[in-house]
Curated annotation (Swiss-Prot):
Subunit composition and interactions: Monomer.
PANTHER family recorded: DEVELOPMENTALLY REGULATED GTP-BINDING PROTEIN-RELATED, MITOCHONDRIAL RIBOSOME-ASSOCIATED GTPASE 2
UniProt binding sites for GTP: 165-172, 190-194, 212-215, 282-285, 308-310
NCBIfam families referenced in this protein's UniProt entry, alphabetically: Obg_CgtA, Obg_CgtA_exten, PRK12296.1, PRK12297.1, PRK12299.1
High-level lineage: Bacteria, Bacillati, Bacillota, Clostridia, Eubacteriales
Chain ranges of the Obg domain: 1-158
Name of this protein: GTPase Obg
Family: Belongs to the TRAFAC class OBG-HflX-like GTPase superfamily. OBG GTPase family.
């Protein structure tokens, strides 16, 4: 089964907790704090691997969680960092944020990597909080939670040349003749349900990769037929061959076929039509095909290359011309993805909503503070109070009409407001 889309959940490892410890050694009467920091949580990293051809593995496993960092120890010993989780994906995989659709990475090269979920930093041990005012702090930080998100993986094949045509135009027959690829061939539409790749060798022993992609129909740019399945894979090709049924065996007109194919590519992505292309009239072994090819050339005013994929007539010459076009084509084809433009504005530390009589406070900074605070320590609680006051939470709550004894909730931490 060829799987070219997947949706997976990734979570970076949580940071290890810092600890509270003091030196208790003979001959060290004033040992002081010695709690070590927690280790950093591991990242989730996707790695491009030429050995993989589909996203099939992600059909059965959808959750990937990296290990957390180790907790700190006494004697100022820091916790070990988590070992990064590396997940292999096929070369040509595009990684997108599932919620926003933003392209996070496009893995085009063997071994190329992308960090998709960062591990949290380790919490600081009490030794970090020692100061002239507080020489023996009895609190530490918890580790920071790792980043987590759902992401989408889309595989776009890396081929030099793409075959564009209606179902039963003879694309599969052509690729089976010019390469060792053996796609399924039969006399009904959509025989090819998955892309096929073949390596072509010209008579001069030059090689290139040809993609036989599922047949196109009118309305494909809107997803009809195999629409988006087809169009996604054609985006990376550097040369396009329009394969047309000149014998009109399906009852369609060959000129109209070309115009529909051209229009579908234009509606999907006009840049596709800027690439080098050849118009190929197939099935020259069938009566009337030659006359239809002449009519096609006359009406379009463009050169039409006549072949028979069944008998091999004209195929060798076509592959030579295709390679010549490929040599002149740009080496890199843009992905077609819209650039993401961000306008950076000052981020508010929190926002306040009143829900069922409870003042709910949310925001990345203040939620991170809650998660990393050890509320079992009086000093840790006092540090939390000082920090939120500096952030302006107390004044903001008063502006929202909070009164003595009202409840405040930040993530899972709930407390009563007192002045």
């Amino acid at each position: 089964m060829f799987v070219d889309q997947a949706r997976i959940f990734v979570k970076g490892g949580d940071g290890g907790n810092g600890i509270v410890a003091f030196r208790r050694e003979k001959y060290v009467p004033m040992g002081g704090p010695s709690g070590g920091d927690g280790g950093r949580g591991a990242n989730v990293i996707l790695v491009a691997d030429e050995g993989l051809k589909t996203l099939m593995d992600f059909k059965y496993r959808r959750h990937f969680k990296a290990e957390r960092g180790a907790h700190g120890q006494g004697k100022n010993m820091h916790g070990a960092w988590g070992q990064d989780l590396r997940v292999k994906v096929p070369v040509g995989t595009v990684i997108k944020d599932d919620e926003s659709g933003e392209v996070l990475a496009d893995l085009l090269l063997q071994g190329q990597e992308a960090v998709v979920a960062k591990g949290g930093r380790g919490g600081r041990g009490n030794a970090r909080f020692s100061s002239a005012i507080n020489k023996a702090p009895s609190f530490s930080e918890n580790g920071e939670p790792g980043e987590e998100k759902w992401i989408r993986l889309e595989l776009k094949l890396l081929a030099d040349v793409g075959l564009v045509g209606f179902p039963n135009a003879g694309k599969s027959t052509l690729i089976s003749r010019v390469s060792a690829a053996r796609p399924k061939i039969a006399d009904y539409p959509f025989t090819t349900l998955v892309p096929n790749l073949g390596v072509v060798m010209t008579k001069e022993r030059d090689t290139f990769v040809l993609a036989d992609i599922p047949g196109l129909i009118e309305g494909a740019h809107q997803g009809l037929g195999l629409g988006h399945e087809f169009l996604r894979h054609i985006e990376r090709t550097r040369v396009i061959l329009f394969i047309l049924d000149a014998a009109q065996t399906e009852g369609r007109d060959v000129v109209e076929d070309y115009r529909i194919l051209y229009r579908e590519l234009e509606l999907h992505n006009p840049d596709l039509l800027k690439r080098p292309q050849l118009i190929v009239a197939n099935k020259m072994d069938i009566p009337d095909a030659r006359d239809n090819a002449r009519r096609l050339e006359s009406e379009l005013g463009k050169t039409v290359h006549c072949i028979s994929a069944v008998t091999g007539q004209g195929v060798e010459e076509l592959m030579g011309k295709t390679y010549a076009l490929l040599q002149a084509a740009p080496q890199e084809i843009p992905s077609g993805e819209e650039p993401v433009v961000r306008r950076f504005e000052e981020e508010l530390p929190f926002k306040i909503d009143k829900v069922d009589g409870v003042f709910e406070v949310s925001g990345p900074r203040i939620e991170k503070l809650v998660v990393m605070t050890n509320f079992n320590s009086d000093e840790g609680l006092q540090r939390f109070q000082r920090t939120v006051i500096k952030m302006g939470l107390e004044e903001a709550l008063k502006e929202h009409g909070i009164k003595e004894g009202d409840s405040v909730r930040i993530k899972d931490f709930e407390f009563e407001f007192t002045e």
